[in-house]
């Protein structure tokens, strides 16, 4: 009997191919056209997206990407490739593919790559520690569309999230401790998660609870008193209310109140990207310092650290 051959698909959001208005426009069009991301009725959304948002937003976002672009591409792509390569090196007999919900490499190209390696079973790991319909749900939807077009469908194991997984929490705690050792222990550790519309949570998305689960476990692992940790939400988009408190408004308030030293971690990002390196490490640093804060440090995402690769190995082990 033929032994089952398993492959691993690491999934993430995606990135423009280049820091140019044209490339950013292509990427944003695909991203903001997904109903999992924006569910505004299409008759209202298409004219707004194509006539206002894409023309105005693309040049501005391209400049932000230019400020963080690396020799190998966007930070998200560079670190995601490093994750893929590091995992493949630890699992020489297991094909590992990388796929993005938007942009390239696509999820479909990742599935095709694994099927070309003659796998019978694919372990899908969306690199979103906290489930949300707008991230993990988008991977699930696209995977279904891809497989619906295939004659041969492999077995699928889909890891929904890992918000309170022990190896994940340990990796975050180690990263925080290293930052404390480098910069000194802060007056406050701010845990900034990507926001979602409040309405999504009201309609059943358990993302806020999964963020609270991560925060609870990380605070416990670090042994910090609750008053030295805050949880906030960043990157809001549009006019409807999003999860609160907002990161930028909180940092301004803390600076004005006299909080001297803050360190910020973004536990929901598996790889550094525009939202961490530009929004948190740069924009929000300025907000805090201009409001009266004295010291601000951003704690990098787990990226391709050995602890992060160990975590991925442990998460996928039961399905390999």
Swiss-Prot record:
Pathway: Porphyrin-containing compound metabolism; protoheme biosynthesis; protoheme from protoporphyrin-IX: step 1/1. The keyword Kinase does not apply. Pfam families: Ferrochelatase. GO terms for cellular component: cytoplasm. Keywords: Cytoplasm, Heme biosynthesis, Iron, Lyase, Metal-binding, Porphyrin biosynthesis. Fe cation binds at residues 194, 275. GO terms for biological process: heme biosynthetic process. SUPFAM superfamilies: Chelatase. GO terms for molecular function: ferrochelatase activity; metal ion binding. Its main location: cytoplasm. It catalyses: heme b + 2 H(+) = protoporphyrin IX + Fe(2+). Its EC number is 4.98.1.1. It is found in: Cytoplasm. Monomer. Catalyzes the ferrous insertion into protoporphyrin IX. Belongs to the ferrochelatase family. This is Ferrochelatase. It comes from Salmonella typhi. The gene is hemH.
């Amino acid at each position: 009997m033929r032994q089952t051959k398993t492959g691993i698909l690491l999934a993430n959001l995606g990135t423009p191919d280049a820091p140019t208005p044209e490339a950013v426009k292509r990427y944003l069009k695909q991203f903001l056209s997904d109903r999992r991301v924006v569910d505004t009725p299409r008759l209202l959304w298409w004219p707004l997206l194509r006539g206002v948002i894409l023309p105005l937003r693309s040049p501005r976002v391209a400049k932000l990407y230019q400020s963080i672009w690396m020799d190998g591409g966007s930070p998200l792509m560079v670190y995601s490739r490093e994750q893929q390569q590091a995992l493949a090196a630890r699992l020489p007999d297991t094909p590992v593919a990388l796929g993005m919900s938007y942009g390239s490499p696509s999820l479909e190209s990742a599935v095709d790559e694994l099927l070309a390696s003659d796998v019978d079973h694919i372990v899908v790991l969306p690199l979103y520690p906290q489930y949300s319909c707008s991230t993990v749900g988008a991977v699930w939807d696209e995977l279904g569309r891809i497989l619906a077009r295939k004659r041969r469908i492999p077995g699928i194991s889909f890891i929904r999230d890992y918000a309170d997984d022990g190896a994940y929490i340990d990796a975050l705690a180690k990263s925080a401790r290293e930052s404390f050792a480098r910069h000194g222990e802060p007056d406050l550790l701010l845990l900034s998660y990507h926001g979602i519309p409040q309405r999504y949570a009201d309609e059943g998305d358990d993302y806020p609870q999964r963020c609270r689960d991560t925060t609870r476990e990380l605070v416990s692992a670090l042994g910090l008193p609750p008053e030295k940790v805050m949880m906030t939400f960043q990157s809001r988009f549009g006019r409807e209310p999003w999860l609160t408190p907002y990161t930028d408004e909180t940092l301004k308030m803390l600076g004005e109140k006299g909080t001297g030293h803050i360190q910020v971690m973004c536990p929901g990002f598996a790889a550094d990207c525009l939202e961490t390196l530009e929004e948190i490490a740069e924009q929000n640093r300025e907000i805090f310092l201009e409001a009266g804060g004295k010291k601000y440090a951003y704690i990098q995402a787990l990226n391709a650290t050995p602890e992060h690769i160990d975590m991925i190995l442990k998460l996928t082990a039961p399905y390999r």
